[in-house]
């Protein structure tokens, strides 16, 4: 693929700025991506990018759970029928600590230099996941980090108000984790006798309805 001269120039300049850190960069499909090796360097590197290459906007913060990455099928044992995929088995996951299970991703924009980049980092501990907040660098990170915490259970050190933002404050679990059941753990309904909303254990059977498909 032919890379534009301007994009290559931006890539080389940013690579030079980050030369003192454990960072790997690439240009793929017309996009610049940098991967940070040590999550403890995230705040310092992003601060450096904002100051020295004028990335004054953080457009998004998100995460990815790689718990089942690379598995070509659900773990369904011997329940695959002759007519195709079985619908009679609940999918179970191993939830033990897995290094590099989660990856956090930052999307940055420099209007002064007319360039966007992606900065990402694999997180080392899958049980206690702690990343320094960048809400002091970009106010837009405040709610974006709250969403990542809510959906993935990643905690942000020094965040001013780390609360759930999409689910209820009493919600159990983190819905975008691969080991979170599709039915959830509890369901909510209005109880006329009590005059309030109540939570009850989910009574829906969790069943695998479709085969797992990974496309190259």
Swiss-Prot record:
> What reaction is this protein's catalytic activity?
a quinone + NADH + 5 H(+)(in) = a quinol + NAD(+) + 4 H(+)(out)
Gene (UniProt): nuoC
Q: How does it sit in the membrane?
A: Peripheral membrane protein
| Protein family (similarity comment) | Belongs to the complex I 30 kDa subunit family.
Note the Pfam families from the entry: Complex1_30kDa
**Full protein name:** NADH-quinone oxidoreductase subunit C
The subcellular localization recorded is: Cell inner membrane
- NCBIfam families this protein is in? NuoC_fam, PRK06074.1-1
Alphabetically ordered keywords of this record? Cell inner membrane, Cell membrane, Membrane, NAD, Quinone, Translocase, Transport, Ubiquinone
UniProt subunit comment: NDH-1 is composed of 14 different subunits. Subunits NuoB, C, D, E, F, and G constitute the peripheral sector of the complex.
- What's its EC? 7.1.1.-
């Amino acid at each position: 693929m032919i890379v534009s001269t301007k994009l290559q120039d931006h890539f080389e300049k940013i690579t030079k700025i980050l030369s003192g850190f454990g960072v790997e960069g690439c240009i793929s499909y017309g996009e610049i991506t940098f991967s940070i090796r040590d999550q403890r360097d995230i705040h310092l590197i992003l601060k450096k990018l904002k100051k020295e290459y004028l990335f004054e906007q953080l457009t998004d913060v998100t995460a990815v759970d790689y718990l089942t990455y690379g598995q070509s099928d659900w773990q369904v044992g011997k329940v695959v029928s002759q007519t195709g995929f079985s619908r009679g088995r609940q999918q179970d996951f191993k939830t033990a600590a897995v290094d590099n299970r989660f990856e956090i991703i930052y999307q940055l924009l420099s209007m002064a230099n007319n360039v966007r980049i992606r900065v990402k980092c694999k997180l080392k501990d899958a049980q206690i996941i702690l990343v320094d907040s960048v809400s002091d660098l970009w106010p837009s990170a405040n709610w974006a980090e709250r969403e990542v915490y809510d959906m993935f259970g990643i905690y942000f050190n020094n965040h001013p108000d780390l609360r759930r933002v999409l689910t209820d404050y009493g919600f159990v679990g983190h819905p975008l984790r691969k080991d979170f059941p599709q039915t959830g753990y509890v369901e909510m309904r209005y109880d006329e006798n009590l005059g309030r909303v109540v939570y009850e254990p989910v009574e829906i059977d969790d069943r695998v309805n479709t085969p797992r498909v990974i496309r190259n």
